[in-house]
């Protein structure tokens, strides 16, 4: 599978917002977005004006990078959202928010979505008592997400959850640190998405 290598802080600076790609570092004064509020590259301080196409593209890239998706993965999710009823943009955000790697990040299983994805593929996470190794697995109400039944997994997850003990949970998730566990109690709503993104611009871009 293709993957991106290289400095991820450049991605946050390119989009002009914190995408929380480096975990706890993004919440400190060392965050590149806070220290250098301009895009990467030569003459980057001259942030030019974007065309309508450019604005739509930036919104799409911002959403992709926030959830750590490749273009093909993003297109598949968009196609699924488009097939459903209701607002396509909101349906897309709900699908991405329900991804197992994103849920594990919100619960505090690991400091970043990238680390959560690695935890899942290495078999450290279970859903309803069964090991799940697919980061794109979509959770549903009633699902119990917890470390796989091994001391190593529980120790890893519990340590990270204690570091994020003060994190506020959205209304559709509940968690306990002892034992380390999260429960899906509902479906995510548009208000639960913390990323400042204009999903309608993404729909317009992908519908061309």
Annotate each predicted stretch with a short phrase:
Residues 119-120, 139:
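Short, well-ordered loop/turn sites that connect or cap secondary structure elements
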Residues 110-113:
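Beta-rich strand-turn-strand
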Residues 1-107, 134-208:
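Ferredoxin-like alpha/beta domains used as RNA- or RNAP-binding modules
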Residues 123-127, 131-133:
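Glycine- and Gly-Pro-enriched alpha-helical subdomains that act as flexible
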């Amino acid at each position: 599978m293709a993957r991106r290598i290289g400095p991820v802080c450049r991605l946050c600076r390119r989009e002009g917002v914190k995408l929380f790609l480096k975990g706890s570092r993004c919440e400190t004064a060392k965050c590149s977005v806070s220290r250098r509020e301009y895009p990467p590259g030569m003459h980057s301080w001259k942030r030019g004006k974007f065309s309508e196409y450019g604005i739509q593209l930036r919104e799409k890239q911002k959403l992709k990078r926030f959830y750590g998706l490749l273009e093909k993965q993003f297109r598949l999710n968009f196609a699924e959202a488009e097939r459903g009823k209701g607002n396509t943009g909101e349906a897309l955000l709900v699908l991405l928010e329900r991804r197992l790697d994103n849920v594990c990040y919100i619960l505090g299983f690991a400091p970043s979505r990238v680390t959560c994805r690695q935890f899942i593929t290495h078999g450290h996470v279970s859903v309803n008592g069964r090991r799940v190794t697919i980061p794109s697995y979509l959770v549903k109400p009633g699902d119990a997400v917890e470390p796989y039944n091994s001391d190593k997994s529980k120790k890893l997850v519990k340590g990270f959850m204690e570091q994020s003990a003060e994190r506020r949970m959205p209304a559709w998730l509940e968690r306990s640190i002892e034992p380390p566990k999260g429960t899906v109690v509902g479906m995510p709503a548009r208000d639960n998405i913390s990323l400042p993104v204009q999903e309608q611009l993404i729909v317009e871009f992908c519908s061309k």
